Amino acid sequence: MRDRGGARAIVVRAASGSVARGCNCACAAHAIAIGPEQESQQGSDMTDTASQIQDKPEREAMEYDVVIVGAGPAGLSAAIRLKQLDPEISVVVLEKGSEVGAHILSGAVLDPCGLDRLLPDWREMGAPITVPVREDRFYMLGEGGSVRIPNIAMPPLMNNHGNYIVSLGNVCRWMAEKAEELGVEVFPGMSCSEIVWGEDGCVAGVVAGEFGRNPDGTPGPGYEPGMELLGKYVFLGEGVRGSLSKQVIERFALSEGREPQKYGLGMKEIWEIDPAKHSEGRVVHTMGWPLEKNAGGGSFIYHLDNNQVYVGFVVHLGYANPYLRPYQEFQRFKHHPMVAELLKGGKRVAYGARAITEGGWQSLPKTAFPGGVLLGCAAGMVNVPRIKGNHNAMLSGIHAAEAAHEAMSAGRTGDVLESYDAAVREGAIGRDLKKVRNVKPIWSRWGLTASMALGGFDMWTNTLGFSLLGTLGHGKSDAEATEPAKDHAEIVYPKPDGVLSFDRLTSVSFSGTNHEESQPCHLKLKDPSIPIDRNLPVYAEPAQRYCPAGVYEVVEKDDGPEFVINFQNCVHCKTCDIKDPSQNIVWTVPQGGDGPNYPNM
């Protein structure tokens, strides 16, 4: 990773010229702009503009029974279950990371219920799941102190007894090995850039493995058009705000009648700490400072083995103040006396960030569509109070595999797997989400204190099988929740000390992030004039603050401000696609293998 001074950046000027340019490329407008015609084609493709004005390249095709996009816990569970049901079923898993696990970032405290169902003997199979939770602690933080909340005051579902502290990336690497042993084909480094549509309008496959476009989108000397991977069914397990999932949700109106999806930004570091301060199996969650009234969110500190701890911070993206900087809130959190004492004398070894779905039951779209399904976080199956979704992701993969196997056994293909959607809503996943459905909207409306009191009460009553509140709505999307800058005071953050807190570019260097600079920018602007002409005067252009990797900058020049996109820094969190108040930024996949390379996240 290099900073903007040594890497190709995309620069957008004001509307007086409406010009987008790259410092190394005269035609960079093609690399970032999505015109009105392309914007109206929701559900066809959102690849770079240059490729859309050319004829489609000729591509070879490979056919499978099931094509799975994403080698996360959901996609790999589906692949394994399909092969368990019928070893003759052909299954391929496509992963955009350089290896399985490279793009996986999660807390993570794993509820093993999904894995128990998928691989009951996982404990004897060498799974990298070896640190059981031994202690739960909950704290309310003030700026200078903390109050521990008695465990007995917490709803039973917040108890982590029987769960495990894991590196989800390593769990996925292990699951991929088990899938391959069963005959699943797993291809890392394969970004899925387009959907292949069937003649009847169903999802028939995906385009994967396109490489070698120039910055302006035209084919370069070593251009590879990729392949069409066609399936009787296509499972989308891309994770939060997946680029293909987003198209499918719009095309088939899967969110019609649902509440807007809500999101958080999760940031995580791995620290090696003093053995005297380490307590393997301890799980700590905090609320309150430094966010307090500015936004919802909280932290986690998980003590795994080898004197390491996961230190994480989540900021709900429905905050109103465009001056808020989620990354700096995380860095400030580590200076709390309780946290600083834990980390004193330690060493940070990794950093990453990823959006989290938080809408829950009210926002869950229809999960089946003609030709495929949405798995796990692509649909939004996270239990927000528990900060857990991996168990539901695994269960969704199992349900999808069973529904597709039943359909193919009956000679069906390309239809809507209604039994999958029913299994998600009426089974363990639906019950898990329904119990906590009101916590997030209570927090969003009335703040932390109300969420602890009223939300906690609602979780208690739901444990008993009823709710006095019914089902509360979310109202605005996170983008719509952003208010004009004139209504808020700018937030002054302390400078990082280089010991506990760090600047964004330094942190990105701890994520292993890398992008080939000669490719088109994967962060598209529907209208290149909006950042400077609208977002800057109205919202003080929040992209320069909400991005946890320093991708976006507003640089003052003699002839006016410029909007700069340092796409090489992108850690694929998707926050820009979610939080941009004008919904002008569209996150698309870069070349396969690019992005972060998380070792043990």
What are the residue ranges of the model-derived segments?
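A short, basic/flexible loop-to-alpha-helix module at the beginning of a structural domain
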Residues: 47-63, 217-226
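C-terminal auxiliary extensions adjacent to catalytic cores
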Residues: 443-499
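Iron-sulfur cluster-binding cysteine motifs and their immediate structural context
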Residues: 27, 32, 537-568, 575-597
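N-terminal Rossmann-like FAD-binding beta1-loop-alpha1 element of flavoenzymes
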Residues: 64-92
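N-terminal FAD cofactor-binding segment of flavoenzymes
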Residues: 85, 96-145
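FAD-binding beta-loop-beta segment adjacent to the flavin cofactor pocket
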Residues: 353-384, 507-518, 531-546, 553
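Predominantly flavin-linked oxidoreductase catalytic cores and closely associated redox partners
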Residues: 169, 173, 178-341, 399, ...
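Active-site-proximal substrate-binding core of FAD-dependent oxidoreductases
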Residues: 380-386, 398, 402-447, 564-566, ...
